[in-house]
Every structure is written in C-alpha cells, then in structure tokens.
Amino acid sequence: MDMSITSRDYVSATNPDCKAKQYTITIDGGYEASVITYGAVITDLIVPDKDGKPTDIMLGCKGLDEYMGNGANHGAVIGRSANRIKDASFVIDGVKYQIPKNEGENNLHSRNPGYQNVFWDAEILSEEEADEIILDSKIAGIPGCDGGAVLLSYTSPDGATGFPGNLDTKVLYCWLEDKTFLILYCGKTDKDTIFAPTNHAYFNLRGENAEGTVNNDLIMINSDKITIKDDMNVPTGELKDVEGTVFDCREYRFIGELNDSDDHQMVISKGIDQNFCLNTTAGTFSFAAAVTSPESGITMECLTDLPGIQIYAGNNLGSPLDIKTTKAYGQYDAICLEAQLVPNAVNLTGFDSPVIKAGKKVYHACGYRFV
C-alpha cells in the first residue's frame, strides 16, 4: 500500500452535534497511526509483529464520549505543563501564578482547559510542507517525513488554567522515513509562560487487548540518574544515581522488576512512575529508551531532544472508561514513555526551564521508532 492520509467524522454517540475529526496516516509495511482533533489524541498505532500481523499497540477508549471523560489521558497531548507542579504555583518574571490544585496541594497535567480536553484545528500537509516544519525546528537528526503529515493547532488563551499569555501551539504528527512516528511540538507566546508538553500514550507491544500485563516485556533507558520525588510524586530537585539500583535500565530489564520493587520511590506510586534524566543532547533527536516484547517480537525505541522521560506502567488504570475494544484495562497493562522536561522544573534549579519567552518559537520532539 502506498502512503495515504484519510479523514472521517468522529462523532459522539450521545450528541450528534458533538464531533471531532479522525485522521489516519498509513505508510508501506503495515504502519498506521490515527489521531483525532479532540485532545490531539493518538487513538491507534498499528505496526506489524514478528509474523507480519497488524497489531494495534495503543491503548485507548471506545469513542469520543469516552475520550472526553478520559481521566487516564489515553494518547492525549498534555499541557500547557505536563506532570506535576509543587503547590500548584510558580513565579515568572517576579509574578506568582496560582493554578488549580487537582492532586492534593499540587497540580497534575494542568487540567481543564488543557491541551488534552479541547478541540484542535487540523490540516493535512504534504511531505514537503512537513519537512519544512521539521527543518524549522532546528532539532538535529530527525529523518525526513514519509509522504505527508497532520498538523494540529490550538491557541491556549491568556489566563487558561491560571497560566499567563496567549500560547499558540502546534503538533505535527507524521511517519518518518525510518519507521518512526513523530510528534513535533511548537509553542509561541505573547507573554513569558510555561510550555512543557508531552504525549500520554499507553503502549502494549503485544496488542492493546492482549491478556496479561507488560511485566514480562523489557525496557532500556538511556539514563544514569533519576529525580527523587516526595510522597506526593513531585520531584524535589534531588538526583539519584541508578548504579546498583532497580532504576538501572541502561541494559534491558523486565518491567515487572520495577513494578515489584520495594524501593520507596516505587511504593509511593504503586509501581514505576518516575522521571529519568536522559543522556541526550539538547537540540538533537537522540535515543532515550526502548521497550521490547519477546512474545510479539515488536521493539519500539523512543527518541527525543528533551532532557527527561517519565516512565509509567499504568499503575492506576482500571476506570470504566479504560477499554477500547474487548479488554478492560487494569494495573500494569501498559507502559508510557513520556518524553518531557523535568517535572516541577519551574520551581527547581539546575534543570532546563519550561518557561518560554514572549515572541520566541520553541520546538520539542518525541518519536517512536520500530526496529
């Protein structure tokens, strides 16, 4: 099959006037990705297993209504600020900003209206148009687009969820020439603000409806240090060497070893939910992590220019909305590889700042490559 991009209405089952668009990007070899304009959600990611069988490795929801009630943020772009902010407050240019306290005294994933719960505009781009955006990012090492792309756009208004500035945001989705599915973020603001997005994709390389957990899959992380978190899962600014610990994933280890560990950092979050400081190079699309399934034979690498990656194993999956086709999802049924800035970095020193300056265009990239 040649490369193609198709679209269809993605309609609420309860309100026919409520609808998004779904775009499906297909390339040779049996690789297919679908995204919707609500939440910039990746609904499907289909790749061949070791026998060539098409396998949807993306957990998700049944339809638009479920995605709109999607507390787990399946496949969604998160922002303006992904992950946690201590005391739900921060200071920019001498001004203190208070955002909603939605996880105890802290803020998690910005919330409504955040990127994950609004409707985005969309357009289909040619390969040449997508490559122009990739070049404009000035992130080295991103291969060329394979055939075409979908570009989603949303302006987060000044004061949304307490954040300053009108923040014009774009997300480019496309397959690259080396079988990488690329997520390229771009933000530009009229007032200094936070721009720290991620995508909350949940992966199961045996298939989204496969029985059992991901504990028997293997993970590798290009990281020598983790950020220590407090008992509310917020990084304190302290770093810990992974050497000699369960966090040492510089060579493949079973995901279950992490989830079953009695390390206090794991106990806090009922399994792995940790930011790893990556050995990546700023401004370069670099290897961050990989997951492989011996059962399906699928190996997926994560590449990014970002300095951190949150590894999360679906420790809290299990709501009635956590079902896409035939299986109700539960704890440890997925692995998330969330390339991002260090959580709570706006309140810490020694980490890349999530604050972008007025008038400056900022790009970040994350890609999932199948090898």
Predicted regions span which residues?
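An exposed, glycine/acidic-rich loop-and-rim segment of catalytic or binding clefts
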Residues: 2-371
